Structure formats: C-alpha cells, structure tokens
From Swiss-Prot:
<comment type="similarity">
    <text>Belongs to the conotoxin T superfamily.</text>
</comment>
<keyword id="KW-1015">Disulfide bond</keyword>
<dbReference type="InterPro" id="IPR031565">
    <property type="entry name" value="T-conotoxin"/>
</dbReference>
<keyword id="KW-0732">Signal</keyword>
<feature type="propeptide">
    <location>
        <begin position="23"/>
        <end position="48"/>
    </location>
</feature>
<dbReference type="GO" id="GO:0005576">
    <property type="term" value="C:extracellular region"/>
</dbReference>
<dbReference type="Pfam" id="PF16981">
    <property type="entry name" value="Chi-conotoxin"/>
</dbReference>
<feature type="signal peptide">
    <location>
        <begin position="1"/>
        <end position="22"/>
    </location>
</feature>
<keyword id="KW-0165">Cleavage on pair of basic residues</keyword>
<protein>
    <recommendedName>
        <fullName>Conotoxin Bt5.1</fullName>
    </recommendedName>
</protein>
<keyword id="KW-0964">Secreted</keyword>
<keyword id="KW-0800">Toxin</keyword>
<dbReference type="GO" id="GO:0090729">
    <property type="term" value="F:toxin activity"/>
</dbReference>
Amino acid sequence: MRGLPVFVILLLLIASEPSVDARPKTKADVPLTSLNDNAKRTLQILRNKRACCPYEPSCCI
C-alpha cells in the first residue's frame, strides 16, 4: 500500500512530460525571414554608428 501513492505520482509526472513540439528551437528551426531581419537590424545599427559625429558623443546614442 505504501508504494501506491509513489506509483500514482510517477504516473502523473510521466503523463505531464512535454511533447516533442515543446522543445526549444535550434538554429536549424529558425525561419530564414528571421535571419534576414536580424541581418538588416545589424546593418542598420552599424550604419548609425558609422554616421556618428566624432565631436558630439550625444548623437551616437
């Protein structure tokens, strides 16, 4: 009788295990549009830093 509650708890834990779809995404799973957006954002940041005024640091922020 002692083992019954432990068995029930283990059974519930196994049943509530995350499914295959709940796995975190890998780099191979990321859509290509997301990578393109990241590249565009990085280029925009680099352009903004390049156009920065050397004599006025506040324009670089």
